[in-house]
């Protein structure tokens, strides 16, 4: 944020050529941010990554209102010779309504975040609120504090028209920039004149631009969220069903050794293993939900600062580990908190569920796993449920048990107490008289003693003898026989229906393309299911589709709000179309920049698109407003459009350059900054296309739509209705 503010200040200094004017603009940034934080505090929001990201994103745009105000004042004072006090009042009043409309337009487009749901809503609503409140505070400051500071700081500054010879390095550089800018402005005016006279050029360019945007949109691909490099790796290892805990531990040690070969010591901090389920009473809602037994576990790897990309190590481990341990199953889980939230509790990006009571669903789920694993871009495809774990079934002789005063429930309870401790079925406590701390008292057969089938048969079973009234411990082998079989170690249900989950992740391909291939597979396999069974795709695919749909609806409503806002401001239904018709060029720039930088279309980049559209609308509104004023003074639509472009080129370029340069550090990104990088790249791409569109296509559209009103005062639509 500080780097962005510094670069923004540098661009303003270059364009205005005055450190005093730059100071006037930069004063509004911290005050607007603090005002936004105050409002967020009263709304119950916290200072977190998303609110800070929103404020960092807003740094470039916060200077917009103050920049336009001081540029307009500076033009009236330095170029037209108006006294400073009069220029301050007239300059602020002249753009008060247009800047209000442009600020509200930016705020309107950010209202689309309210249509989000799920994790995306809780992530991006604070970001949107931070930007909106900062923008509103910036407008209030530009109406109050900025004119005051202009009067205080600029009164001792010499005018550009005073004819003084520049002294000092900065003054000479500023004068040289002004000469270069005037040549640019003259060249722009000549080029705009050509566009306005040769009307076929703009439609041809527009068609080419839209075609480019359509191609880039197809090539960009879609994701729910960019991959975050948190410097952590979480590897899930599953040994064959029935593997003993000590064997599992040896496997994990061998896997650790292989990880150390792949990840050098200078890049890793530590490696931690978590094998099996918790031994004592523990709420498994707080544990890793994908761990199902003693043959299962997680290896967590923490990397040092400055490490090589985590994704490269993960890609290498996906190649090395299955080759070294072909009997074991490996899959990587989300290690960073953002991706864990986006997965919404699932251990993978994609969860394809086979639901229903039919026994054939297991075979369909296994075929589904094989089909998914063959899809390009799918990695770590595995069936979560383990259905072939070895087990002993105790077949109780009910007649013999009844003779001993037992029933099946009593025998089962005794087995449970012996193998899993009495803590589960009959918890007892002992309170330390000194400290008052209660402790569990539990009875359990030591695991090392249950080392054979005979030892299992010697499990004590309490036998109630009605004759003597005494309780005599008997042996389990007296009332039961044992049979080897297989059993499912875990069972899942959704809406009471049994579920088989096939989990998978994506690597080297966008989620949207993978989702399209998954839908083809599920459509084919759905035909093999009996009535009452179904296949459901959840996880990030579902979240992505919902978020894209809701954001699209939100953007549609935002466009309607912005249009109606301009209708009220311009008092006509026609002029707002000049602004609306220029927005597709902004979207074309966004998708083009995303393609060039290798960034997919995702929720953060859509948030950047929202901001770029808002800024483009704001600049177009100011230009159209100035052109309308010129036409009301009696100029033709051609002359008004040319004059508006010639006059507003400086604030448009200054605002766009300040935002683009301020976004560059965020766009470069780094480890853990991928979400902000996608957002910033979308803003930069949108503004790179929106700026020439505002300066060239908007005047062209204005001249075309208003050419019938040449030399005539234009009445508002509501005035026309009244007449």
Model features per residue range: what roles?
Residues 1-3, 13, 70, 85-87, ...:
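Extracytoplasmic/periplasmic membrane-proximal domains and adjacent transmembrane bundles
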Residues 6-75, 115, 133, 561-648, ...:
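Hydrophobic transmembrane alpha-helices and their membrane-interface caps
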Residues 11, 59-73, 96-115, 122-174, ...:
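Transmembrane alpha-helices and their membrane-interface boundaries in multi-pass membrane transporters
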Residues 41, 45, 113-123, 203, ...:
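Transmembrane helices with small-residue packing motifs
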Residues 70, 76-101, 124, 548, ...:
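Helix-loop junctions and hydrophobic alpha-helical segments within the transmembrane domains
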Residues 79, 85-89, 119, 125, ...:
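Interfacial helix-loop-helix hairpins and adjacent transmembrane helices
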Residues 95, 166-226, 273, 324, ...:
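Signature of alpha-helical transmembrane segments and their immediate interfacial
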Residues 246-344, 399-425, 434-435, 448-449:
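Solvent-exposed, membrane-proximal periplasmic/extracellular interface segments of envelope transport
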């Amino acid at each position: 944020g500080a780097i962005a503010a510094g670069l923004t200040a540098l661009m303003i200094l270059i364009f205005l050529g005055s450190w005093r004017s730059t100071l006037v603009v930069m004063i509004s940034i911290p005050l607007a941010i603090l005002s936004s934080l105050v409002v967020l505090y009263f709304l119950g929001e916290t200072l977190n990554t998303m609110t800070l990201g929103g404020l960092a994103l807003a740094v470039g745009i916060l200077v917009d209102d103050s920049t336009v105000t001081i540029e307009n004042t500076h033009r009236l004072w330095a170029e037209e010779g108006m006294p400073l006090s009069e220029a301050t009042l007239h300059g602020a009043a002249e753009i008060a309504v247009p800047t209000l409309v442009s600020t509200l337009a930016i705020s309107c487009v950010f209202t689309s975040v309210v249509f989000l749901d799920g994790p995306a809503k809780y992530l991006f609503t604070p970001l949107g609120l931070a930007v909106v409140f900062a923008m509103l505070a910036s407008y209030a400051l530009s109406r109050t504090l900025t004119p005051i500071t202009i009067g205080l700081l600029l009164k001792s500054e010499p005018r550009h028209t005073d004819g003084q010879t520049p002294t000092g390095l900065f003054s000479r550089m500023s004068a040289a920039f002004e000469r270069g800018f005037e040549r640019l402005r003259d060249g722009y005016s000549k080029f705009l004149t050509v566009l306005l006279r040769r009307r076929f050029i703009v439609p041809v360019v527009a068609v080419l631009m839209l075609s480019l945007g359509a191609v880039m949109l197809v090539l960009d691909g879609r994701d729910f969220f960019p991959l975050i490099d948190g410097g952590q790796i979480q590897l899930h290892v599953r040994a064959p069903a029935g593997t003993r805990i000590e064997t599992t531990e040896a496997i994990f040690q061998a896997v650790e050794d292989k990880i150390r070969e792949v990840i050098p010591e200078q890049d890793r901090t530590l490696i931690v293993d978590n094998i099996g389920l918790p031994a004592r009473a523990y709420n498994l809602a707080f544990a890793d939900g994908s761990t199902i037994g003693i043959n299962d576990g997680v290896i967590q790897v923490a990397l040092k600062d400055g490490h090589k990309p985590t994704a490269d190590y993960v890609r290498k481990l996906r190649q090395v580990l299955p080759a070294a341990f072909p009997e074991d199953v490996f899959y990587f889980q989300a290690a960073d908190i953002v991706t864990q939230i986006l997965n919404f509790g699932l251990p993978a990006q994609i969860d394809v569920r086979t639901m229903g009571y039919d026994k054939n669903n297991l075979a369909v789920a296994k075929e589904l796993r094989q089909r998914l694993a063959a899809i390009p871009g799918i990695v770590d495809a595995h069936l979560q449920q383990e259905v072939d774990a070895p087990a002993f079934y105790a077949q109780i002789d009910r007649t013999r048990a009844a003779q001993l005063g037992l029933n099946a429930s009593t025998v089962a309870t005794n087995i449970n107490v012996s193998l899993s401790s009495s803590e589960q079925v009959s918890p007892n406590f002992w309170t330390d008289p000194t400290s008052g701390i209660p402790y569990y008292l539990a009875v359990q057969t030591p695991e090392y003693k249950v080392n054979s089938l005979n030892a299992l048969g010697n499990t004590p079973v309490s036998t109630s003898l009605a004759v003597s009234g005494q309780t005599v411990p008997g042996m389990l082998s007296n009332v039961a026989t044992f049979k080897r079989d297989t059993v499912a170690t875990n069972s899942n249900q959704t809406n009471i229906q049994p579920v088989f989950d096939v989990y998978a992740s994506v690597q080297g391909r966008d989620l949207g393309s993978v989702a399209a291939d998954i839908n083809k597979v599920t459509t084919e396999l759905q035909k093999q299911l009996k009535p009452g069974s179904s296949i459901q795709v959840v996880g990030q695919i579902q979240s992505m589709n919902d978020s894209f749909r809701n954001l699209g609806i939100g953007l549609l409503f935002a466009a309607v709000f912005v249009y109606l806002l301009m209708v009220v401001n311009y008092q006509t239904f026609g002029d707002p179309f000049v602004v609306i018709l220029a927005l597709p060029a902004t979207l074309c720039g966004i998708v083009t920049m995303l393609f060039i930088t290798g960034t997919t279309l995702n929720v953060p980049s859509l948030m950047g698109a929202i901001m770029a559209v808002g800024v483009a609308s704001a600049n177009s509104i100011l230009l159209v407003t100035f052109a309308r004023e010129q036409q009301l003074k009696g100029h033709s639509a051609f002359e008004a459009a040319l004059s508006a472009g010639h006059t507003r080129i400086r604030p448009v370029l200054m605002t766009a350059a300040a935002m683009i340069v301020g976004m560059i550090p965020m766009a470069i990104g780094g480890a853990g900054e991928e979400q902000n990088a996608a957002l910033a790249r979308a803003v930069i791409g949108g503004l790179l296309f929106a700026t020439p569109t505002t300066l060239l296509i908007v005047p062209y559209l204005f001249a075309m739509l208003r050419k019938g009103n040449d030399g005539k005062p234009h009445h508002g639509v509501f005035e026309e209705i009244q007449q």
